[in-house]
Amino acid sequence: MAKTLYEKVWDSHVVVANEGEAPLIYVDRHLVHEVTSPQAFSGLKVAGRRLRAPEKTFATMDHNTSTKSASLDALSPMARIQVETLQDNCKEFGIKLYDIHHKNQGIVHVMGPELGITLPGTVIVCGDSHTATHGAFGALAFGIGTSEVEHVMATQTLRQNKAKTMKIEVKGHVTPGITAKDIVLAIIGKIGMDGGTGYVVEFCGEAIEALSMEGRMTVCNMAIEMGAKAGMIAPDATTAEYLKGREFAPKAESWEQAIEAWSELKTDADAVFDSTVILEAADIAPQLTWGTNPGQVVAIDGVVPNPQDEPNATVKASIEKALEYVALSAGTSMKDVSINKVFIGSCTNSRIEDLRDAALHAKGKHVAEGVTAIVVPGSGLVKEQAEAEGLDKIFIEAGFEWRLPGCSMCLAMNDDRLEAGDRCASTSNRNFEGRQGRGSRTHLVSPAMAAAAAVAGHFVDIRQTL
């Protein structure tokens, strides 16, 4: 029977599938951070259970750590409690921890892949919705709740219902200046933020295959923003090249065996998807959100939509509510929208390729008057590489702040946050009301678009700035 990539990975991980109940699947990798793990560890202690597979569990600190200082004194009282609790729990249960003083510390979805923890054909879970990022390697990766975190800790398994399958094919090649962030925002704009609900999405097509692993991670990262359970991309030579030699990747003879196994991780030619969506890559322009969800997105040469043009009453009301919150008027050109804050970072866009793209638009220029811009590398390794390439100097000389790794301004959970009324060009993944701070207004863009906006003080078409 012909199978999709998702079905192949799923079927190989089913432990028990009894009629009338959700199947039990095996988990290969469990990623842990300081925010969603404390209660899970407490549950293990109360029940007197040990960790089932400490060697398959990896922890880091990222959500509420400071990007200004690696000192515990820089944390809020609650953040410090969470960080110190994770330290204690990892020590007690024998878990590998990349704490704020470790050179490899970083955002969990940046750190995992770059260390080779993420591998094709594996099932990966984490108490974080953007675990879908790891699907870029042909892994089945998804976020779980705290009670599920405890279940995986205790059993290395999880009960899950099988999802439907969706293929999103991006045909042809993008034009110069178009990035993975533009591709995924265009997809969300097409199908909506609930278009993938109930599905595991496989991204394919020439435009997807042409992406680097960094770009593929950006696309899969935002599968959640289209409502999907997970996003996946079939592994290929690009995947193998990225993984070879990384700390936790297979070595020597095991590497050759892995390459052979990974070659089978692709959708069979005659496999049938439950749903198919097709986009033409050449039609994709630089994208940016105008409203309060990732589906409220337009091209840079577009305008803020008019709710009066929307026939659906529910959608019309949503547009009106969003316009009121973001303080924009229908018909406004997106190029006329001014910003006063810029955030380049997050698990969506904080990898070395992202920083290189942003630096191209910052080099020899300067942040506009009245604009505050921060650049937050996704991990210690990304920071080290960027500094070796001189990217930090480019940003600093251009007036950007160069920070330590962490989730930072993606969410208002640490000391990087917006004030009420701030308007931010952000490379993160969510532009919900208050996401970056109470009363803040967020516009999702690519790193290049964010850097260009920082310099201009408003959104610009990056295709015309280089």
UniProtKB/Swiss-Prot annotation:
Pathway: Amino-acid biosynthesis; L-leucine biosynthesis; L-leucine from 3-methyl-2-oxobutanoate: step 2/4. GO terms for molecular function: 3-isopropylmalate dehydratase activity; 4 iron, 4 sulfur cluster binding; metal ion binding. Its EC number is 4.2.1.33. Binds 1 [4Fe-4S] cluster per subunit. It catalyses: (2R,3S)-3-isopropylmalate = (2S)-2-isopropylmalate. It is an enzyme of class 4 (lyase). Its cofactor is [4Fe-4S] cluster. The keyword Iron-sulfur applies. [4Fe-4S] cluster binds at residues 347, 407, 410. InterPro entries: 3-IsopropMal_deHydase_lsu, Acnase/IPM_dHydase_lsu_aba_1/3, Acoase/IPM_deHydtase_lsu_aba, Aconitase_4Fe-4S_BS, Aconitase_4Fe-4S_dom, IPM_dehydratase_rel_enz, IPMI_cat. Keywords: 4Fe-4S, Amino-acid biosynthesis, Branched-chain amino acid biosynthesis, Iron, Iron-sulfur, Leucine biosynthesis, Lyase, Metal-binding. GO terms for biological process: L-leucine biosynthetic process. It comes from the Bacteria. The keyword Metal-binding applies. NCBIfam families: leuC, PRK05478.1, PRK12466.1. Catalyzes the isomerization between 2-isopropylmalate and 3-isopropylmalate, via the formation of 2-isopropylmaleate. Heterodimer of LeuC and LeuD. Belongs to the aconitase/IPM isomerase family. LeuC type 1 subfamily. This is 3-isopropylmalate dehydratase large subunit. The gene is leuC.
